[in-house]
């Protein structure tokens, strides 16, 4: 099966509305798996309620049978290639947003996530074929 990878700001896991369900059902009907890393515009309160599973060597939130959130600091083996994932980013407009409504602190990588990413890369001898990210961090933990 083919994989379609979206690099952040997925937008289909927001509030459980009929709009979310319409698009997730549509994505699930396609002849490929939809994989995404988180961006800085995600509803992390909802996203983090999904079950964590292993998929192609890394941890994911399974959203639907063919829709997966590739979690931060993981390496996935897809079609013979290693993909390292580091989602998130910094919202430049945070001063105009409301926490837990349209902005979440979880958009920024935590120290624990950074440590996990380094450990994962160490286990893979710092050899991956692709790095998937959404945004460049202006700072790090």
Range-by-range predicted roles:
Residues 65, 79-141:
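Active-site-proximal loop/helix segment associated with metal-binding centers of metalloenzymes
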Residues 1-78:
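Core catalytic region of metal-dependent phosphoesterases/phosphodiesterases
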């Amino acid at each position: 099966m083919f994989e379609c990878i979206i690099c952040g700001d997925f937008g289909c896991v927001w509030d459980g509305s009929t709009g979310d369900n319409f698009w997730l059902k549509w994505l699930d009907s396609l002849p490929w798996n939809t994989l995404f890393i988180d961006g800085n515009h995600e509803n992390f309160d909802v996203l983090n309620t999904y079950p964590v599973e292993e998929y192609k060597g890394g941890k994911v939130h399974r959203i639907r049978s063919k829709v997966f959130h590739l979690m931060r600091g993981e390496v996935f083996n897809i079609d013979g290639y290693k993909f390292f994932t580091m989602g998130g980013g910094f919202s430049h407009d945070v001063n105009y947003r409301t926490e837990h409504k349209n902005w979440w602190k979880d958009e920024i990588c935590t120290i624990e996530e950074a440590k996990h990413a380094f450990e994962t890369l160490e286990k893979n001898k710092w050899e991956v074929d692709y790095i998937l990210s959404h945004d460049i961090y202006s700072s790090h933990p």
